[in-house]
Amino acid sequence: MVKVVRNVVCPFCGTLCDDLEILVEDNHIVGTRHACRIGNAKFMHFEGAVRYTEPLMRENKKDDFKKVDYETAIEETARLLTEATLPLIYGWSATECHAHMYGVELAELVGAVIDNTASVUHGPSLLAVQDVGYPVCTLGEVKNRADVIIFWGSNPMHAHPRHMSRYSVFARGFFRERGREDRTLIVVDPRETDTAKLADIHLQVEPHKDYELVSAMRAVLKGFELQVDKVAGVPADLIYEAVEVCKNAQFGELFFAMGVTMTRGKHRNIDNAIQLVIDLNAYTKFGLMPMRGHYNVNGFNQVLTWVTGYPFGVDFSRGYPRYNPGETTANDLLQRGETDMMLNIASDPGAHFPQKAVQHMAKIPLVCIDPHETPTTQLANIIIPPAIAGVEVEGTAYRMDGVPIQLRKVIDPPEGVLPDREILKILIKKVKEML
């Protein structure tokens, strides 16, 4: 008989939709309701996806994997961590916050560098927030109040498919009962994306010229006249129009994504964008929000900041936390060949890091805590399979606006498979025995 589990939180993207219904039969998920295509794929087990149910180990990366028990795999991982000079513990964005807590404790014990995927996506946003502040609100406020929405360097139609219908553009809110008709949508993007096609105003900025465009908007806002016909490829008239719309908004929200953080200028772009929002607050209410990708990338930044005071890329090699992005971040350590052991959990750097970093990953001992086969597990010496957070085990995740949400358990994990936090607990115990 099919059982319907209601109000399930989707553990895929930073929108963390919490209205899913999952159809379960004999401890198998047979269908989903209300989920987007990506959310549906997270819950449904598709043909071709290789799920690990037992730990695997090999001495040499050219050998085949041999099945071992959890005890052996975790003990060997503990040995590698304690014997390494500078271990790197990376990932964290697709697991829950209790695992993060144990991860930070482990990093402190072994004197490791601990980093998460923010260092290759919204790291610059966090640097900008440290520089100039963070005029923020929740997605609920955006849904109920915002009548001007800006998507800057962001394409939620593909990256966060339910964001527009649930929280921003199409959502019917308390003061915005007509949904889309009550809102003006401005999209800043060099390409005509599916999101840009829906825009009332599309500012087609030239690549790497975001800083110039923000500066021009700030100048216009302060009453200066532009002396040129175009700024960053955008006609001056369109800039005047966009600024006028923002000034006359009752409540505005600027959503920005990796189109701004990973283009030329990095955190200086965000500095300027935050200053634009601060300037706009002289006229009306305006907020800004990073479009966080993985469902709990924000959660790790929160946990690490509570414990160490720094959001990502923290180096414990001297026994106390040090933070210097560019020196203590995963990519830089790997490309310079400074780390001699890597523990990867809940991420896939093998598929996304530059070639030079992946080449170094192939040379050093690599342990993966991952439920499925990925390009990173192909490079690993040890694979430890966990239960999937948000599907087979509950926990806490932080939405893109910093609201913590409780993940639901929908089905039981495969027999004998432990959650991330249990694996890390045992690992900490083994490390303490060896030190």
UniProtKB/Swiss-Prot annotation:
- Keywords per UniProt: Methanogenesis, Oxidoreductase, Selenocysteine, Tungsten
Q: Does the keyword Zinc apply?
A: no
Do you know which Pfam families this protein is assigned to? Answer: Molybdopterin
According to its UniProt record, this protein's enzyme class is: oxidoreductase
Q: Which GO terms describe its biological process?
A: methanogenesis, from carbon dioxide
Mind listing the GO molecular function terms for this protein? formylmethanofuran dehydrogenase activity
Q: In which pathway does it act?
A: One-carbon metabolism; methanogenesis from CO(2); 5,10-methenyl-5,6,7,8-tetrahydromethanopterin from CO(2): step 1/3
User: Which reaction is the catalytic activity of this chain?
Assistant: N-formylmethanofuran + 2 oxidized [2Fe-2S]-[ferredoxin] + H2O = methanofuran + 2 reduced [2Fe-2S]-[ferredoxin] + CO2 + H(+)
The keyword Disulfide bond is assigned to this record: no
**Entry's CDD domains?**
MopB_FmdB-FwdB
Q: What is its EC number?
A: 1.2.7.12
Q: Which cofactor does it need?
A: W-bis(molybdopterin guanine dinucleotide)
SUPFAM superfamilies, from UniProt?
Formate dehydrogenase/DMSO reductase, domains 1-3
Physiological role: Catalyzes the reversible oxidation of CO(2) and methanofuran (MFR) to N-formylmethanofuran (CHO-MFR). This enzyme is oxygen-labile.
Assembly behavior: This enzyme is composed of six subunits FwdA, FwdC, FwdD, FwdE, FwdF and FwdG.
The UniProt similarity line reads: Belongs to the FwdB family.
Name used for this protein in its record = Tungsten-containing formylmethanofuran dehydrogenase 2 subunit B
Organism in which the protein naturally occurs: Methanocaldococcus jannaschii (strain ATCC 43067 / DSM 2661 / JAL-1 / JCM 10045 / NBRC 100440)
Q: Give the organism's phylogenetic lineage.
A: Archaea, Methanobacteriati, Methanobacteriota, Methanomada group, Methanococci
